[in-house]
From Swiss-Prot:
Residues 62-126 form a propeptide. Disulfide bonds join C19-C55, C20-C47, C28-C45, C32-C41. PROSITE patterns: THIONIN (PS00271). GO terms for molecular function: toxin activity. GO terms for biological process: defense response. Transmembrane segments: none annotated. Pfam families: Thionin. Residues 1-16 form the signal peptide. Its main location: secreted. This is Alpha-1-purothionin. Coiled coil: none annotated.
């Protein structure tokens, strides 16, 4: 779980910058990149890939409109992350204690990921 989120975050930093019009587009792109190709995810989520230092006009990287659906979007991102990544870890755990630890750390990573916290501490710490 944490490795997957770490790889997604690392890909976002190494590859071209993804520029999205909204938080919904940003979350869509981030979740899609867990399995999808950069160009595919950008197209599906209506984002653009920029190799420059800034995003094209109309595609702010993480800017939100004042009346955006940010809380709902973040909640859906958290639910999607937890159900697709953290639930998988339940089956991988050897015992109840290990499962509890995995799920707790995974849930924390999902919250940070969905809130756009690019300054995550090293995921190896989990």
């Amino acid at each position: 779980c944490l490795l997957i989120l770490g790889l997604v975050l690392e890909q976002l930093q190494v590859e071209g910058k993804s520029c999205c019009r909204s938080t919904l587009g940003r979350n869509c792109y981030n979740l899609c990149r867990a399995r999808g190709a950069q160009k595919l995810c950008a197209g599906v989520c209506r984002c653009k890939i920029s190799s420059g230092l800034s995003c094209p006009k109309g595609f702010p990287k993480l800017a939100l409109e004042s009346n955006s659906d940010e809380p709902d979007t973040i909640e859906y991102c958290n639910l999607g992350c937890r159900s697709s990544v953290c639930d998988y870890m339940v089956n991988a755990a050897a015992d109840d204690e290990e499962m509890k630890l995995y799920v707790e750390n995974c849930a924390d990573a999902c919250v940070s990921f969905c809130n756009g916290d690019a300054g995550l501490p090293s995921l190896d710490a989990y």
